[in-house]
Amino acid sequence: MGEISQETVEKYLEANPQFAKEYFNRKLQVEVPSGGAQAPASASFPGRTLAEEAALYLELLEVLLEEAGSVELAAHRALQRLAQLLQADRCSMFLCRARNGTPEVASKLLDVTPTSKFEDNLVVPDREAVFPLDVGIVGWVAHTKKTFNVPDVKKNSHFSDFMDKQTGYVTRNLLATPIVMGKEVLAVFMAVNKVDASEFSKQDEEVFSKYLSFVSIILKLHHTNYLYNIESRRSQILMWSANKVFEELTDVERQFHKALYTVRTYLNCERYSIGLLDMTKEKEFYDEWPVKLGEVEPYKGPKTPDGREVIFYKIIDYILHGKEEIKVIPTPPMDHWTLISGLPTYVAENGFICNMLNAPADEYFTFQKGPVDETGWVIKNVLSLPIVNKKEDIVGVATFYNRKDGKPFDEYDEHIAETLTQFLGWSLLNTDTYEKMNKLENRKDIAQEMLMNHTKATPDEIKSILKFKEKLNIDVIEDCEEKQLVTILKEDLPDPRTADLYEFRFRHLPITEHELIKCGLRLFFEINVVEKFKVPVEVLTRWMYTVRKGYRAVTYHNWRHGFNVGQTMFTLLMTGRLKKYYTDLEAFAMLAAAFCHDIDHRGTNNLYQMKSTSPLARLHGSSILERHHLEYSKTLLQDESLNIFQNLNKRQYETVIHLFEVAIIATDLALYFKKRTMFQKIVDACEKMETEEEAIKYVTIDPTKKEIIMAMMMTACDLSAITKPWEVQSQVALLVANEFWEQGDLERTVLQQQPIPMMDRNKKDELPKLQVGFIDFVCTFVYKEFSRFHKEITPMLNGLQNNRVEWKSLADEYDEKMKVIEEMKKQEEGNTTEKAVEDSGGGGDDKKSKTCLML
């Protein structure tokens, strides 16, 4: 045979890599040369050089790289080599995890020898040996996170012979070390029974530690990747469930179903089931009768922590293995495969998270040991947890079955499932809120219907004003033509000149409230809006009568006040000639808003609403009563039979509603001081203009200026009683004062607070002084500026000034009276003091003792 060249050998080895690998594995332990220079010896591997030690690590890295896809395979190859290097009889790997909040170790690779097969050493999930950390040396290693070299296990208090009894193997000594990542123990590696010695040496510990430091890289890499997948799944679950939860707000079942079905691919299980609990806490009285009569046994079954009977009214099964399927079972029977074990009921009763390994073997719960249905599917591992809402009531139970990779559910699965169920539970707040809103909306509709029934003008009340039956001999108003109704209504309305409707001095006291309704109707005809905007007179009559009924029978803010404000608005527009700045539609809206501005007033002011925390105060943050008057007015217009603006187009109607908002909110005196400077600037600008047309153009070209003037007009109308003739003003002022005193009485009795002087009945004699202050501080500016703006409005200022003279006279009389009383009081106090001095004996020496007698 010829000589083999180096080139031939290289070609053969390259062509047969498996042979080359096996050959070098066998020849790895080379003999130390006997002569010549020796290579440096390894401290960790006796009998090997540093080069050979490096070759071992290189081989390990190649193995780890080759088996990087499976942590079990990589660990198995490493344990095989360790068993050889340490001369250990066998090696094992235990994984560390946590379930139900309790850490534990579970066997993953057992009895690994240099020649054993991976399949024989791998422990499948349903055959794992699981220990808590307080059992066995492996548990103690995981607990302390330290390496332990135990020369004699019988002398170690932590040793447990459980595994020996199961396998018949006898453990004499062992070496165990943890793989730690941060504060978390990932696994425990163990070498058992030194073959050529009675115990593992210090050098064995070093070999074990160094070798496993490389293995730990793979474990940490896999664990990091696992944590990344966990967080990715968690974020996807939260994102998709949030997306679906906010898609569905009307029904909790549909909300749950949309969210749970969308995230099914991220739950990593074969099946999951959602049981929805009956939320009824108290039974109806008629359901309790049979129990009280003894005909039915009282309920003695499990109850939720808040006292509800555990009744699943619906179960939804999500089957993800094989053909995907969703089954909805209303009123499920107790022998349904999810309920028969008793686990969902237990979770609903106690609120615990239950993570069960090898569930069919559990003795407490009765899981089916065989297939649960025709698919042949078998329960292995179970994770069940409650769905809890923000009130901490258990609303359902979510149960997950069989992790797809065959492993039991771990603490990270618990975290993901808990995140999902917690989010679903909290999302119930949306549906609960939506349901409450619906109920409130329905109650509002019912209340509105009741309100309309009692407030809306009846047919007989309409007939009392619109006398179609008497004049047309027609029984049903629908049979009348609109022109006929207009004619008979206008005939029956008062003459505006005779009734002084164009005058600022108009007096309402001699006129009945019913006649005031007719006067109000007349004003709409006077501004020519009824025919122009095609307002049905029946609707106008019904609206005006309903507005009158909407005012409560309070002392001052009643229908008479409402009408007076409307009449003053009309007078400002027509007599005061402010109409030239506004269109007919705007004038129509302003007049209607003036009539409605205090509708449903309660006789108390905004401050009282806030102090008493009334529903109105909770509903409206500012301008409380004004916003209520506005909403009431808009509510009336929502009824077609009361909508006097029904024939306007959309844009016109929106304009009217906007003007209503500006006009009615402007009556809040708290806003008066904000707007009066702006109004004064408009007046100053108009006063400098030479022609009327120039002033009209200046105002009308800017909608904001028109709104400011309108807001100030509403204030002037609201305070107009202060400008009426003295005989009217003096009576009205007493009505206002009485209403204030009534509020003061409420503050004193209900709120237990001392009212301010203006509302204190005990200080009613100070009314003239308070009126003078009110005129000077609030009213004078309004009417002075309007008189400057339009000379036609000067009568209001004159009336105000005349009334101030009267009130000042009364205030001065009161001050004089109080001054006299004060002087008399001082004089009386002086006399009392002199008498006290005389009685004390200071007046002379002839005073005798009343207790001692000189004989």
Swiss-Prot record:
Binding site for a divalent metal cation 2: 598
Enzyme Commission designation: 3.1.4.35
GO cellular component term of the entry, any: plasma membrane
Membrane topology term: Lipid-anchor
Record: residues binding a divalent metal cation 1: 561, 597-598, 718
Family designation: Belongs to the cyclic nucleotide phosphodiesterase family.
Subunit and interaction comment: Composed of two alpha' subunits that are associated with 3 smaller proteins of 11, 13, and 15 kDa.
Name of this protein: Cone cGMP-specific 3',5'-cyclic phosphodiesterase subunit alpha'
Organism: Bos taurus (Bovine)
